[in-house]
Design a protein with these regions (language model features):
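Short amphipathic alpha-helical "interface-anchor" segments enriched in bulky aromatics
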Residues: 95, 243, 302-334
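Electropositive, glycine- and tryptophan-enriched low-complexity nucleic-acid-binding patches
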Residues: 47-51, 56, 114-192, 273-293
Length: 411
């Protein structure tokens, strides 16, 4: 936390530290501020923690900006140390589910849930919050670099009706939020880095593709079947290429088993794009009637190289799993949009700390995943608590005051 150089007052810094630390230590199913403060010895009233989010004069950007600079500097230092110059930038959004009865929290609304929807005819909507994340990977090191909360345009208009002009929110599309985060990244990335930006078909807009190419970055992403390559839609190309041989590409699945995919390669320009791209048509077997389409702007790469790079998007899904399941991202109980942003900022500070410990763990600790880091952090807290309690009991020659100090008693 000290390495972030947060520009907060001492009370603000203490509340951020308490909440972030308790988020990691807590094993509660729902990590509310009250439950987190019950873990802290001689903690102030939980309302102080809530007030630090609701009315304390700091913003989410006061945490986001230091995390961006810290993670960027750490990766640049590692690049010079390991002589690793290929940076993979993953972009994705995630939906944090809230109870259906949650109505009066400004950041909570119904969003289209593409993981539960069954095509356009059977859409599914989930009540919750949506955030967009940018993740960086350089060699064996990786960080959640930046994030943004997303609100639908209708929700922004509704909230602005009750706000003073200087407090009104501005609606931004998901692709616009993504472009803003990538623009900030461009200022931190050294010129010698070779950058690949990875995202799914939801972000494969022409504006985002053009933006990445203007920075000199390459893009590897999924495409929807209705995009036009040359004079045909992508959905028409499999039939047109039915006499062309498949290339067999082997990929390692999450369970480390090798799986073979049948791939055909195309080159051309998409509608309203001036640069040539490579498009892969992939299917798991000959009988599959719904192939997947992938785009790559680096024409020097083969299909066997492109698809493993696209697989590097998977860890961002793991990040989203940890912030939601283990760090309580969707467990906030604050009403205003700004307070919710602060909660998200504290959660991502906790995630950055865990990722830093994972990246810098000594070899003898055998730390291989964020779960190992969380387990180690909880063990260190438990050991410190036990040692302190034993030392105080020995000093006082009485265990009753020690129990009164270290055990929580509900009133």
């Amino acid at each position: 936390m000290c390495g972030l150089h947060l520009r907060l007052t001492k009370p603000q810094w203490q509340h951020v530290l308490r909440i972030a630390d308790a988020l990691i230590v807590s094993e509660a199913r729902h990590k509310t501020i009250a439950s987190l403060y019950r873990l802290i010895v001689e903690a102030p009233d939980p309302s102080n923690g809530a007030d630090s989010l609701r009315i304390s004069p700091w913003t989410a950007e006061d945490l986001r900006a230091p995390v961006r600079h810290f993670t960027g500097a750490d990766l640049v230092a590692y690049a010079h140390e390991a002589q690793e110059w290929t940076l993979y930038v993953s972009l994705d959004d995630s939906l944090g589910e809230k109870d259906k009865g949650t109505r009066h929290l400004e950041a909570v609304e119904y969003h289209h849930d593409h993981t539960k929807s069954q095509g356009k005819k059977n859409p599914y909507y989930t009540n919750g919050t949506v955030h967009i994340e940018v993740r960086l990977q350089l060699g064996v090191r990786s960080y959640a670099y930046d994030w943004r909360l997303y609100l639908r345009e209708k929700t922004v208009r509704c909230l602005n009706r009750r706000r003073a002009p200087e407090q009104r929110l501005r609606f931004r599309k998901k692709t616009s939020l993504a472009r803003d985060m990538l623009a900030g990244l461009q200022q931190l990335v050294p010129a010698e880095f070779r950058v690949y930006v990875l995202f799914d078909s939801w972000y494969a807009s022409n504006r985002l593709l053009k933006f990445c190419r203007r920075q000199g970055w390459h893009v590897i992403c999924a495409l929807k079947s209705n995009r036009t390559l040359g004079e045909k839609k992508l959905s028409q190309w499999p039939h047109a290429l039915r006499h062309q041989r498949y290339q067999r590409v082997q990929l390692s699945a999450a369970d480390q088993r090798l799986r073979t995919y049948l791939v055909r390669t195309l080159r051309g320009t998409l509608t309203q794009l001036s640069f040539e791209v490579c498009v892969l048509i992939s299917r798991p077997h000959h009988r599959d009637k719904h192939p997947k389409y992938f785009l790559c702007t680096d024409l020097a790469l083969s299909a066997q190289q492109i698809l493993p790079i696209y697989q590097k998007r998977w860890p961002i899904e793991v990040d989203n799993f940890y912030v939601k399941q283990h760090l309580g991202l969707a467990d906030f109980r604050v009403q205003s949009y700004e307070a919710t942003e602060k909660w998200f900022a504290v959660v991502f500070v906790a995630l950055a700390f865990l990722q830093w410990r994972l990246n810098h763990a000594p070899a003898e600790e055998r730390v291989r995943s964020l779960a190992d880091v969380v387990r180690q952090h909880r063990y260190e807290h438990a050991r410190t608590l036990l040692e302190t309690a034993c030392q105080e009991a020995a000093r006082l020659a009485d265990y009753v005051p020690v129990l009164q100090r270290f055990l929580y008693h509900s009133t």
